Amino acid sequence: MVLFIILAILVVILIAIGVLFYMRSNKRNLIEKTEERKNEIEQLPLDDNLRKLTGLNLKGETKTKYDAMKKDNTETTNKYLAPVEEKIQNAEELLEKFKFTAAQTEIDDAHELMDQYEENYQHQVTQVDDIINLHKENEALYEKCKVDYREMKRDVLANRHQFGEAAEPLENEIENYEPKLNEYENLKSEGNYVQAHNHIAALEDQIKNLKSYMDEIPELIRETQKELPGQFQDLKYGCRDLKVEGYDLDHVKVDGTIQSLKTELSFVEPMISRLELDEANNKLENINDKLDEMYDLIEYEVKAKNEVEETKDIITDDLFKAKDMNYTLQTEIEYVRENYYINESDAQSVRQFENEIQSLISVYDDILKETSKSAVRYSEVQDNLQYLEDHVSVINKEQDKLQNHLIQLREDEAEAEDNLLRVQSKKEEVYRRLLASNLTSVPERFIIMKNEIDNEVREVNEQFSERPIHVKQLKDKVAKIVIQMNTFEDEANDVLVNAVYAEKLIQYGNRYRKDHHHVDKSLNEAERLFKNNRYKRAIEIAEEALESVEPGITKHIEEQVIKE
C-alpha cells in the first residue's frame, strides 16, 4: 500500500516536472519571437528616412526641423530600442528559474517599447514626407505664379484697348508681383519653407483675384460704354413710338429717369480705372434694376391695353344682360305679386339694382370716352373695367337668384297642391281599410285624427283660393299635414296588424279551452279587450296563455300574419 502511494507521488512529481518544462518551452518560443521582432525593428531605416531631407536646403526652418528630428532619433533609440535587449535577457534568466509570470512581464515590456519605437518611426516618416511635399507644393505654386505673372503682363500690353483707363493700374499691380516672387526665392534660400509656403500661397491668391478682375473689366467697360447707352436710346425711342400709338406713359418718367441713370453711369468708368470693381458692379446693378422697373411699367401698359380690348366686350354683354334682366324682374314682380306674396325687400333690391346698373353704364360710357383720347393710361382703364366687371357680376348673380325665386313660387304652389291631393286620397284609403277590417269599431282616436286632417285640408284649400298667396306659409302648413297623414297611416297600420294578430291568437287558442281552464279564462279576457279596441293588451294575454301550453307558437303565428 505504501509502495503504491510512493509510486503515485512520483508520477505526480514527474507530471508536474513535465508540465513545467513544457511551459518553459512555450515561453522560450515567445522570447525567440520577441528577439526576431527586435531584429526587424532594428532594420527600420530611421536615419535613412531622415537623410531624405539632406537634399533640401538645410538652413533656417528646414535646418532647425532636421536637427530636432535627428535628436529625436537618438532619444527614441536610447529610450525605446536599447532597453529591449536587456528585457529579453531578463526574461531568459527568469525562465531558467521557472518564474513564468515575471518572464511574461519582461516580454510584454519589451513589446511595449518596440511598439513605441515603431510609432515614433511612423511619425518621423510622416513629418519627412510632409516637409518634402510642402517643398514640392511651394515650387509648383511658384512656377504657376511666374507663368501667370508673365501672361498677365503680356495680356495687358497686347490688349491695352480692352482695359481702357484700368490698364495702367493693372500694370502697376502686376509689377508689384515681381519683388514678391523674389521674396519667395529669398525665403527658400534661407530654408524657411513654412514662411515661403505662406508667402507664395498668399501671392497665388492675389494673382488669381487680379486675373478674375482682368477677365471682368472688358465686360464691365463694354456694358458701360455700349450696352447701357444703347438700352437708354432704345427705351427712349420705344416710349416715343408707344406715345404715338396712344399710350400715356407720363407716370414712367422716362426722360428724367434716363438722364439720372446716365449721370450714375458716368461714375462707373472711374471706379473701373481704380479697380474698384465691387463698387462698379453695385452701381451697374442699381442702374439695371431701375431700367427693369421702367420696362415692367411699360410692359404692364401694353398688356393692359390688350386686356382692355378683351374686357370691353365682356362688360358690354354683362351690362346688357343686367339691364334686360332688371326690366324682366320688375315686370315679373308686378305680375307675380297679384297672385303671390312678395317680400318688399326683394322689390326694393330690384329697384336698387336698376339704379346701380344705370350708374355703372354711365361709368362705362366715361371709360369708353377715356379710351378714345389721344393718350390713354391703359393700366388705370383696366383697373376701372375690373371694378365694373366685379360689380356687374355680383348684380347678375343676385338678379338670377331673384328670378329663380319667382319661378320657384309657382313650382312650390303646384307642389303644395299636389301634396294636398295625395293627402286627401291617402286619408280616405286608410279610413276605408279601417272600416273594412275585422275591428269591432273604428277607434275614436282615428276618427279624431281624420277630422283634424280634414279641418287642416279645408283651411289650406281656403288659403289656395285667396290672393296673394303666402307660398312659404302655405308650403309649411302642407308639410305639417303630410306629417299628420303619415302618423295617421302608420298608427292605422299598427292597429290593423295587431287586430289580425290578436284574432289569430284567439282562434288558435280555442283548441285548448276545453282541456286548459287557465287558457280558456285568458282567452275570454283577450276577447273582452279585443271588443274594447285594446288590441295590444289582448295580444299580451293571448300570447302568455298559448306559450304556457305550446311554447314558440306565437312567433310562428306572428310570422304568418306579417307575410299576409
Curated annotation (Swiss-Prot):
It is found in: Cell membrane. It comes from the Bacteria. Residues 1-4 are extracellular. Pfam families: EzrA. One of its GO terms (cellular component) is plasma membrane. Residues 84-126, 165-223, 271-303, 350-435 form a coiled coil. The chain crosses the membrane at residues 5-23. Keywords: Cell cycle, Cell division, Cell membrane, Coiled coil, Membrane, Septation, Transmembrane, Transmembrane helix. Residues 24-564 are cytoplasmic. One of its GO terms (biological process) is septin ring assembly. InterPro entries: EzrA. The keyword Transmembrane applies. Negative regulator of FtsZ ring formation; modulates the frequency and position of FtsZ ring formation. Inhibits FtsZ ring formation at polar sites. Interacts either with FtsZ or with one of its binding partners to promote depolymerization. Belongs to the EzrA family. This is Septation ring formation regulator EzrA. It comes from Staphylococcus epidermidis (strain ATCC 35984 / DSM 28319 / BCRC 17069 / CCUG 31568 / BM 3577 / RP62A).
